């Protein structure tokens, strides 16, 4: 019985970016996020309760090798949060990213309509910063719409989930 539980709790069956290799429409993240994109999202705690909502304005500039992405989040409690990403394309399927509140480098993987972004973010909580690991997926729906789902963990335990809809101008 213990072996069964350990096997079923492992991450071997987790969704992988390569699972979307031959699917359409293809999400080329530097193309989709270039220009203006509007977003709306909800943050849920580990129990699934919606704790915050936001709208966001994104503006990206692609120079042929690197995407500079400016994000401005307007939270429903009045907080305004900004972030600037520098996302570098390594090859057709691999990316690296940095931002002021990201620990080290983010790793990105692009296949078909899916883009997976893995990173550790410094999140302000009660006057201090916590390191939260993000497993961030974006799925392109058509030329204008993409859906984002991010799972946030601390010490391997889920602490929150984020659901976002993007609409490109």
Residue ranges and their predicted role:
Residues 1-49, 61, 169:
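Amphipathic/hydrophobic helical signal segments and adjacent flexible N-terminal regions
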Residues 21-25, 55-56, 101-105, 133-135:
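Short structured motifs
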Residues 40, 44-125:
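Central antiparallel beta-sheet cores of small beta-barrel/beta-sandwich binding domains
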């Amino acid at each position: 019985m213990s072996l069964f539980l350990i096997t079923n709790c492992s991450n071997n069956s987790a969704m992988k970016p390569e699972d979307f290799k031959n699917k359409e429409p293809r999400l080329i993240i530097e193309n989709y996020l270039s220009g203006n994109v509007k977003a709306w999202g909800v943050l849920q705690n580990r129990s699934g309760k919606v704790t915050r909502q936001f709208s966001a304005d994104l503006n990206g500039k692609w120079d042929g090798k690197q995407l500079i992405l400016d994000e401005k989040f307007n939270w429903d409690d009045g907080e305004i949060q900004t972030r600037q990403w520098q996302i570098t394309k390594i090859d057709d399927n691999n990316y690296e990213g940095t931002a002021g509140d990201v620990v080290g480098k983010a790793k990105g993987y692009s296949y078909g309509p899916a883009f997976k972004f893995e990173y550790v973010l410094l999140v302000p909580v009660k006057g201090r910063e916590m390191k939260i690991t993000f497993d961030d997926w974006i799925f392109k729906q058509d030329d204008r719409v993409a859906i984002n789902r991010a799972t946030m963990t601390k010490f391997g335990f889920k602490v929150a989930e984020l659901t976002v809809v993007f609409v490109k101008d």
